[in-house]
Amino acid sequence: ACKNRYLKWVVGGDNGTQYSRCPTPATCNLVADVYHSTPAVIGNPSEGLRDEGYQRFASSNARKRPLVLYTSTNDGFLHAFKVASNDPADSNDAAAKVLTKASNELWAFIPPAVLPKIPSEYPNVHQLLLDGAPIVRDVPGSTPSAAGATIKLERNLKSIGTSESDWRTVLVQSFGSAAPGYFALDVTDPVAGPKFLWQLI
């Protein structure tokens, strides 16, 4: 029962207690404070690299990815907000549409290392749980031919310029002043959501 109340509190639901992050729709505030986490704004791949694999990657993502702002908040979440569409046709797509009077949040992610610390802020204690600045880069890799195999963020001479050559957009962030350590997400398709890659603590 306590676990369920806590989970409802984290996402802003009515947890049946006097403590709520959304007392009323007009006073709902699920985004905590941003302190040292300088936002990163990322759109289409734009690096002019003379690499066949990268050119395929840039072409396949051209005018597809919305402009996304990444920042973390001290309640332990990394947030992804859609700030602009790169394709006018996206205005007909509910997932890609940017609303001027809404948060336009695509998703929020809690690194595994932060999860055990979140109960310390319940019901209303300010903590520095995630305070680093995200860095986003396009990273070369190779896709093994086996079905269901994971992408390796590394390359060798054999894979360059072949069908195994692949690129991903990867976000790496430290935990900042909250704790030592780093985590990484694959944010190649921000609308579909992030893929957790690793964490170092």
Enumerate the language-model features and the residues they cover.
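A fold-level detector for beta-propeller and closely related beta-sheet-rich head/sensor domains
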Residues: 1-201
